[in-house]
Amino acid sequence: MIQWFLKYRPRSLKDVENQDGAKKELQEWIESWLNGKPNAKAVLLHGPPGVGKTTLAEAVAHDYNLELLEMNASDSRKLQDIKGVAEKASVYGSIFGTRGKLILLDEVDGINVREDTGAIQGILELIEKTKYPIIMTANDPWNPALRELRNKTKMVGLNKLGKYPLRRLLKKICQAEKIICDDEALNYIIDTSEGDTRYAINMLQGIGEGYGKVTLDLVEAMARRKERELDPFETLRDIFWARYAWQAKNAATSAQIDYDMLIRWISENIPIQYDNIEDVWRAFDALSRASIFLKRAKGGDWDLLSYAYDLMSSGVAAAEIEKKKPNWKPKWKKYQFPSYIQLLSKSKDIRDTRDEIIKKLAIHSSFNKTLNDTYPFFLIFYKKYDKRLSLNTKEKEYLNSASKS
């Protein structure tokens, strides 16, 4: 099912509200390109999240019959990826019968200049050599890393959508989707969104589709969850109960725990949440793929981390086939801590005793080297040296037990 903020996004510039100044600047700029005398090779659209930067770029392509070549610069970070966009634009002709092409580089402020060496330089080269107009978007255009880009582009700022236009849009969506929404709830969504149209629509969809109506109590509960990180139990519930990919991924990325621990929590509770063995199989299949992407991401290709999150959240949530039925209702289950954590907790005292012994041994060597190289042999003949090490009763009991196992 499509997300509402995509379903109801403006297709044409005439449908974009509250951005008259930005629309005029973009129209003058794109027409200067089409007339062969561009007043700037690239535009940097900037504004807070959810104000419609990407939508505005897509509307320009639609209205002027331009083929849109889109790339998320913060995901495709490598220099060769950015150069690939230039090659596609310059080498390949349009297969859609359009007047030309428009290059869109989304979220350029998401580029990490330390990890993504050459990315900014690649964009600068693309701007210098481009045969087609380029639109870039950024939430924070004043990021120091973007200084050279600012100098090479025409900057166009976007406003937050005002309360009245946002109210009209939300009411229109409610009518189209046949969702009952209280006026108080609508006001709360508008105030909480602070001009973030995408957030407002997502909140409306999340509650409206889940409960069939939007009330102030439900909206307040959802808003409170957004303002804080979710504990592991809330995270699991939001993932397993999600009917849409974005709901599950939002839960995963809002979790208090990191991705490694989140995978352990999900793995432990999949058999608890899903009764159907095929659902369990599909969920573990998604989770195993997430583990593969996570391992590769840790190897240095951090672009793959997003795929790991997709699979451990949306992939696991989609495993339950019953969710496709309109009358599906989530099942409340009592989740449990990962057995891995329980085992670590139970063995903590034992491990602490072992570590104290190793510290006494590691006089001229590191702790890890002593643990891996010296300690296994020490277990064999420790009784000859226990007095020299001043071992206490607890440590002697541990060594007696460990040497027998």
UniProtKB/Swiss-Prot annotation:
CDD domains: AAA, HLD_clamp_RFC. Keywords: ATP-binding, DNA replication, Nucleotide-binding. SMART domains: AAA (SM00382). GO terms for biological process: DNA replication. It comes from the Archaea. ATP binds at residues 47-54. Pfam families: AAA (PF00004), RCF1-5-like_lid (PF21960). One of its GO terms (molecular function) is ATP hydrolysis activity. InterPro entries: AAA+_ATPase, ATPase_AAA_core, P-loop_NTPase, Rep_factor-C_lsu, RFC_lid. PANTHER family: CHROMOSOME TRANSMISSION FIDELITY FACTOR 18 (PTHR23389), REPLICATION FACTOR C SUBUNIT 1 (PTHR23389:SF6). Belongs to the activator 1 small subunits family. RfcL subfamily. Heteromultimer composed of small subunits (RfcS) and large subunits (RfcL). Part of the RFC clamp loader complex which loads the PCNA sliding clamp onto DNA. This is Replication factor C large subunit. It comes from Saccharolobus islandicus (strain Y.N.15.51 / Yellowstone #2) (Sulfolobus islandicus).
